[in-house]
Amino acid sequence: DEDEDILVKIQKEIGHKNALSHYSQEIDIGDKHYTSHTSRLIISSQKMVEDLEKFGIVKNKSNILNIKIEDIPEEFFFDFLRGIIDGDGCISFTVGGTCNLTITTSTIMAEILNEKIKLIYGKSKFYLTHRHKEVLENATLQATNKHFIYQILERTYKNANIYLNRKYNKYLDYKQYYETHFKKS
């Protein structure tokens, strides 16, 4: 599992001693056969569950997502956003071409995130779309403004120590590209 690195970081951060669990699953899609490898960090802490539930983070959260974002202290908002980008986001750009930051989540969470960004920056350059018009519960927040994307990613990854390596590396690539081509000294 290429994303196992974040589980190891979380495991170290909370002092969890149990080993990660590893799973393989055979998947057939059309005439293609795949083997999916997954890693899990299993934590059995009722206190941690209760603490997370206070913020609306519950089992099957992607479908329910009842986060009370106003209860998240502002100094932790970008850590929270990093978790969302790592889990359900995409950072993409082409040299000399387009830049995109997308987050796919519930429509309610997309609206809440967009409002929080507006409160912090005075406006938001994210726009909300529904990729599947028949599924209005899910939405995509997308930003294409290279300066806005840079601002968001800089605050999101500044002083971060827990992140998905592949997303962090994408951020570093974008940062270098942006600072080389667009940032004014």
What are the roles of these predicted feature ranges?
Residues 1-185:
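Internal intein/HINT superfamily modules and their associated LAGLIDADG
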